[in-house]
């Protein structure tokens, strides 16, 4: 795996964990070079404990949390694009002129193309069209990725950004509704608050269908690193977070498998693999 290169394109610090953290850690441990692009510093995120950050310092704190997670998972380099967190859909943060969703798509595309051509990844990971749960920034990075990948491969596009590079494969990490339901059931069995899961019906309607998952990975060997990465993001995953309600042994069982849908090239048939790099000439 020493010559393999994997690039994650995401919106916020902590996007690198839930659907893919164990996979990133496992590939990194076996020699794959893993890099991450984060378009914002999560300025509009929560602050679980006021002792950890203020609204004014949150971006700086979350950058350090991201770097902690990167060290934990084996990510060799993180690029922050510096756009502002757009916040949840319908909030005032959406209107900020510096918000990522208000950025110039052509500018973002060019910046991503430059990174792709420099790093020359064999696999790119990014959000599916709904962005997991409809976050505007998640949807934006999905759209910008699908624009940047063919642009990076086009030798006529912006020669000043480096030599053209055709990315062999793009995947969407998928957080299955079934995984969240399992977590809910285990929390209910312990008499814990499960109100967080009330919006699952919306995920069922807009989320990624199970029959279009192409790679299933058992991350039992690196699920501890994944859970440790959650703890790096202390401002987002405080004691009240649903990801800290179950004992670690149970959470390790719930999150043991990670799922990926192949976006580029579109697979001709449904097929379940175990390796994102399968059959890619390296």
Locate the predicted segments by residue:
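Active-site rim/loop-helix segments in enzyme catalytic domains that contact anionic ligands
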Residues: 1-120, 150, 261-262, 269-272
